[in-house]
Amino acid sequence: MITQEHYCALPAPKIRTLKHLRTFEVTLDKHGLGPVAGVDEAGRGSCCGPITIAACIMPQRPIAQLQALTDSKKLSAAKRAELYPLIKKYALAWSIIHISAAEIDREGIQHANIFGMRRAIEKLDVAPGYVLTDAMKVPGLRCPSLPIIGGDAAVRCIAAASVLAKHSRDLIMDDLGGKYPEYGLEDHKGYGTKSHMDAVRHHGATPEHRYSYSNVKAAHDQWLQEKTQ
């Protein structure tokens, strides 16, 4: 039987077709280690809004409607929006967790990310027998897990989780863009672009900003200084 130790030495498979995208999941499942859950996050590098983590268990069969599935960063916003309900429809189980900016400031991004991944896995309606993540180790799980570098482009369940996380978070950032129109959050999704930091320097940070991030703190402090002069 293939064990976790066997897999720790394996690189992510070279992807050419959707069949290759399912290689890790199918092999683990055939050796009695399924069901296999994929986990990924969106918004870790952002300085505003939540970090969003999704977990997903996909059926071990080809799904024609998901032929376009790959790493969410390689898909257009329109394609992610198209795949989002289809993934929910065909997945055996899925979950989405949002960790707020306030919690990120309180606990740190690394802790928030790992905690969110554990929570997303625990929230699945189907208990996984094995968990595959996109490069990040997640301690404290009830089943074996394996981080795969480039997993969001190499493993179907991770790719599915990446789309769920990215699109779900984008919807939140679109809503925050309407709530705080001065910052253009619906465009840059909370990442530290020049226009975003200029807006923080001009208007100050919102409650949705991550004050523990140095770029937010510097821009917000500049706004405070100019405000008090």
UniProtKB/Swiss-Prot annotation:
It is found in: Cytoplasm. Keywords: Cytoplasm, Endonuclease, Hydrolase, Manganese, Metal-binding, Nuclease. This is Ribonuclease HII. Belongs to the RNase HII family. InterPro entries: RNase_HII, RNase_HII/HIII, RNase_HII/HIII_dom, RNaseH-like_sf, RNaseH_sf. One of its GO terms (molecular function) is RNA-DNA hybrid ribonuclease activity. Residues 34-225 form the RNase H type-2 domain. It is an enzyme of class 3 (hydrolase). Its EC number is 3.1.26.4. It catalyses: Endonucleolytic cleavage to 5'-phosphomonoester. Its cofactor is Mn(2+); Mg(2+). GO terms for biological process: DNA replication, removal of RNA primer; mismatch repair. Gene3D superfamilies: Ribonuclease H-like superfamily/Ribonuclease H (3.30.420.10). Endonuclease that specifically degrades the RNA of RNA-DNA hybrids. GO terms for cellular component: cytoplasm; ribonuclease H2 complex. It holds the Pfam family RNase_HII. A divalent metal cation binds at residues 40-41, 134. Manganese or magnesium. Binds 1 divalent metal ion per monomer in the absence of substrate. May bind a second metal ion after substrate binding.
